[in-house]
Amino acid sequence: MDSPEKRIYIFDTTLRDGEQSPGSSMNPAEKLRIARQLEKMGVDIIEAGFPIASEGDFLSVQQIAQEIRGAQIAGLARANNADIDRAWEAIRDAANPRIHTFISSSDIHLKYQLRKSREQVLKEAVAAVERARSYTPNVEFSPMDATRTDRGYLCEMVEAVIAAGASTVNIPDTVGYAIPQEFGELIAYLRANVPNISQAIISVHCHNDLGLAVANSLSAILNGARQVECTINGIGERAGNTAMEEVVMALRTRKDLFGFYTGIKTESIYQSSRLLTQITGVAVQPNKAIVGANAFAHESGIHQDGLIKEKITYEIMTPQSVGISDSHIVLGKHSGRHAVSEHLKKLGFNLSDTELNKIFVRFKELADAKKNVFDEDLEAIVYEELYRVEDKYKLIYLNVVSGNVAIPTATMQMEVDREIVQDAGFGVGPVDATFDAIRKITGTNYDLLRYVVNAISGGTDAQGEVTVQLKFNGRSVVGHGADLDVIVASARAYINALNRLEFLKRDAGKIKSEYE
């Protein structure tokens, strides 16, 4: 049996730091869906957001805190009373609430960002922890840019915040500057030079600017860290964060070396990765470790021969261990409501009768149009029907004329604020014409940053899944749509992005946490 001192706690910040990745903004329903999945996975702590950033963030964190019972819920707060008070208001109903407060500690940040002395910052750090501690004993403190902070001052700050009541001290590699040997030595140095370090859990938060976030986190574990802050798929600002699935599977696969374990149900990893991709539209690179499309693919004849004879010749873990099924059940037009319901449960979707009815109607429409309906088809339907923002704009009708002679023309009818509007658009191709019609009907003209088409499954009758990224006032959103007709899918994706932008406008004035 695994001993408690060998337990590594997983702190997931997909909903906070991960959401800072360009185009990855999520609405409250999507955040709640991710939080439920994280709870199902066995994540120990969910950082639900930055409550003071906006009213939308506050309400989203509050909703997660009120529903999720199987994980600690953390709210981020800068080292000031207003942030800390607001964070507590958002998370107070959680089964086990945590306030995560932070302040910069490196001389670079003190000089150019805070414009404060070391003494001032130390005093503010202690005061912040004391304030948070007045609400809950579960307080985490982070000295931002710790890897570029003078070690003597870092030790002084860590000792002071632990004395003030911090139960977890997190060491962030904010700019992804450290290398594994150096980062591991830093954790060992803190353990050796902070007298009260045993009174707190040491956590690490690594960024991937040099591609070393996972390696740095593992090095920290070998040197005494017992909590790792990470995100699904490694999503995050700039080059991203520590990928949860990679840390978890490294510890599991090389238990002979590490000797540690997590509480993560690894069979939920792949579904979690797919869900995040569906929601954000941020695709996983094919050669991504653990969850990439090629992670368990072997093309070399020698490798294939070895796998046929004995899988352990070239596979260090099984696809099933991360939730990739080796059996691919296909549904069709004769599949009934119960079969669809049971299949959705296997995919991790426990739907209400009302939700199932919506999905089943879309399923029957799709099954009548194509021979086989695959897992990916069902996932696309579930996302589009159940996890989208409230619609200001809806597609009612689309007809496109195109070819090598005709000028591409799109005639479209939409519902705009419950009013029916019709217009036509022209362009250099059918998609361009469709987008032109949408812009005319909605009176919008945002920058189109990205347009991507993927086949959800194989075959000429595969659904097309389209991702569209639009930019508004320096912020971007991703919309997506799926349909057997790629032009219709494109229209749905563009309209979905517009609806997400409308949500962002309502949540305008959002404050960025600055913490990474």
Swiss-Prot record:
SMART domains: LeuA_dimer. Signal peptide: none annotated. The keyword Flavoprotein does not apply. It catalyses: 3-methyl-2-oxobutanoate + acetyl-CoA + H2O = (2S)-2-isopropylmalate + CoA + H(+). GO terms for molecular function: 2-isopropylmalate synthase activity; acetyl-CoA C-acetyltransferase activity; manganese ion binding. Residues 394-516 are annotated as: Regulatory domain. It is found in: Cytoplasm. Its cofactor is Mn(2+). One of its GO terms (biological process) is L-leucine biosynthetic process. Its main location: cytoplasm. Its EC number is 2.3.3.13. Mn(2+) binds at residues 17, 205, 207, 241. It holds the Pfam family LeuA_dimer. Keywords: Amino-acid biosynthesis, Branched-chain amino acid biosynthesis, Cytoplasm, Leucine biosynthesis, Manganese, Metal-binding, Transferase. Residues 8-270 form the Pyruvate carboxyltransferase domain. Gene3D superfamilies: 1.10.238.260, 3.30.160.270, Aldolase class I. GO terms for cellular component: cytoplasm. Pathway: Amino-acid biosynthesis; L-leucine biosynthesis; L-leucine from 3-methyl-2-oxobutanoate: step 1/4. Catalyzes the condensation of the acetyl group of acetyl-CoA with 3-methyl-2-oxobutanoate (2-ketoisovalerate) to form 3-carboxy-3-hydroxy-4-methylpentanoate (2-isopropylmalate). Homodimer. PANTHER family: 2-ISOPROPYLMALATE SYNTHASE 1, CHLOROPLASTIC-RELATED (PTHR10277:SF9), HOMOCITRATE SYNTHASE-RELATED (PTHR10277). Belongs to the alpha-IPM synthase/homocitrate synthase family. LeuA type 1 subfamily. This is 2-isopropylmalate synthase. The gene is leuA.
